[in-house]
């Protein structure tokens, strides 16, 4: 027989749509709760891509690619105006 998992302990991908509003309200939105969520996300990323037995540069490349895309999105407003210029 399957044991019933409380809604608070379910992961986001395990929550049904009708349970989603109550699941969101059960989350911890205090600064320490948000910091803990970021810490858990960082730990998951680090253990999955960086701290592996046969490590490669792919985990660091993903961070660098995200940085490049983020920087481009931030500077897009300035780059947009220089796109059609013929001369300096």
Swiss-Prot record:
GO biological process: proton motive force-driven mitochondrial ATP synthesis; proton transmembrane transport
Residues recorded as bearing N-acetylalanine in the entry: 2
InterPro entries: F1F0-ATPsyn_F_prd
Transmembrane segments: 62-79
Keywords of this entry: Acetylation, ATP synthesis, CF(0), Hydrogen ion transport, Ion transport, Membrane, Mitochondrion, Mitochondrion inner membrane, Phosphoprotein, Transmembrane, Transmembrane helix, Transport
GO cellular component, one term: proton-transporting ATP synthase complex
Residue numbers carrying N6-acetyllysine: 16
UniProt membrane topology term: Single-pass membrane protein
Location of Phosphoserine modifications: 3
Record's subcellular location: Mitochondrion; Mitochondrion inner membrane
Annotated function: Subunit f, of the mitochondrial membrane ATP synthase complex (F(1)F(0) ATP synthase or Complex V) that produces ATP from ADP in the presence of a proton gradient across the membrane which is generated by electron transport complexes of the respiratory chain. ATP synthase complex consist of a soluble F(1) head domain - the catalytic core - and a membrane F(1) domain - the membrane proton channel. These two domains are linked by a central stalk rotating inside the F(1) region and a stationary peripheral stalk.
Family in the record: Belongs to the ATPase F chain family.
Subunit structure: Component of the ATP synthase complex composed at least of ATP5F1A/subunit alpha, ATP5F1B/subunit beta, ATP5MC1/subunit c (homooctomer), MT-ATP6/subunit a, MT-ATP8/subunit 8, ATP5ME/subunit e, ATP5MF/subunit f, ATP5MG/subunit g, ATP5MK/subunit k, ATP5MJ/subunit j, ATP5F1C/subunit gamma, ATP5F1D/subunit delta, ATP5F1E/subunit epsilon, ATP5PF/subunit F6, ATP5PB/subunit b, ATP5PD/subunit d, ATP5PO/subunit OSCP.
Protein name stated in the entry: ATP synthase F(0) complex subunit f, mitochondrial
Native source organism of the sequence: Rattus norvegicus (Rat)
Classification of source organism: Eukaryota, Metazoa, Chordata, Craniata, Vertebrata
Name of the coding gene: Atp5mf
């Amino acid at each position: 027989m399957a044991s019933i998992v409380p809604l608070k302990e379910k992961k986001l991908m395990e929550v049904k749509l009708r349970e989603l509003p109550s699941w969101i309200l059960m989350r911890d939105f205090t600064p320490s709760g948000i910091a803990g969520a970021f810490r858990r996300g960082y730990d998951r990323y680090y253990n999955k891509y960086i701290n592996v037995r046969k490590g490669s540069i792919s985990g660091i490349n993903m961070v660098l690619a995200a940085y490049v895309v983020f920087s481009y999105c931030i500077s897009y407003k300035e780059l947009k105006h220089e796109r059609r210029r013929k001369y300096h």
